[in-house]
A protein has these predicted regions:
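Short beta-strand His + acidic residue motifs that chelate non-heme Fe in jelly-roll/DSBH
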Residues: 45-46, 64-65, 82, 88-95
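Short acidic-glycine-tyrosine-enriched beta hairpin
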Residues: 68-85
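Glycine- and acidic-residue-biased ligand/ion/polar-headgroup-sensing regions
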Residues: 50-62
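A short hydrophobic beta-strand segment most commonly corresponding to one strand
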Residues: 54, 81, 96-112
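Conserved short histidine dyad/triad with adjacent acidic residue
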Residues: 34-49
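A short, N-terminal "cap"/entry segment at the start of jelly-roll beta-barrel domains
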Residues: 1-31, 115-124
Length: 124
């Protein structure tokens, strides 16, 4: 059995916020669970080429926007799932940070970070 608190896990600056990675590849669970903070007012061009991801909003507000401009509003109680390695923009409202519980499959190593200085969607 694995039991961990937020104070016991690694905190990674993923590029536009923080990610507390509760379960990673080394735990041999087959998935990652993270508590992800998205900085207020940030817009992140993201794509997970090797992972599927689902995010459940627990605090704050924001949007996830597809490359064709389709916009989905995020608020506590809303989940979105990237089931086709979708390129997308994750946007946090300027009023405050957005908090998500993120699940990745296959699991992350735990040290991954995004790079937003490229001309393409940041990926890992």
């Amino acid at each position: 059995m694995i039991v961990r608190s937020k104070t016991e896990v690694d905190c990674v600056d993923w590029g536009n916020g923080l990610s507390y990675r509760f379960l990673t590849q080394r735990d041999n669970m087959g998935f990652t669970v993270a508590h992800t903070l998205v900085k207020a007012g940030s817009k992140s061009p993201l794509q997970y080429r090797r992972h599927l991801e689902a995010c459940y909003c627990i605090a704050g507000r924001g949007q996830v926007v597809t490359t064709d401009g389709t916009t989905f509003n995020l608020s506590p109680g809303v989940i979105y799932a990237l089931d086709d390695h979708d390129e997308h923009f994750l946007i946090a409202c300027s009023e405050g940070d957005m908090e998500l519980i993120s699940v990745f499959s296959p699991p992350l190593r735990g040290d991954e970070r995004h790079s937003f200085d490229q001309a393409e969607f940041s990926h890992y």
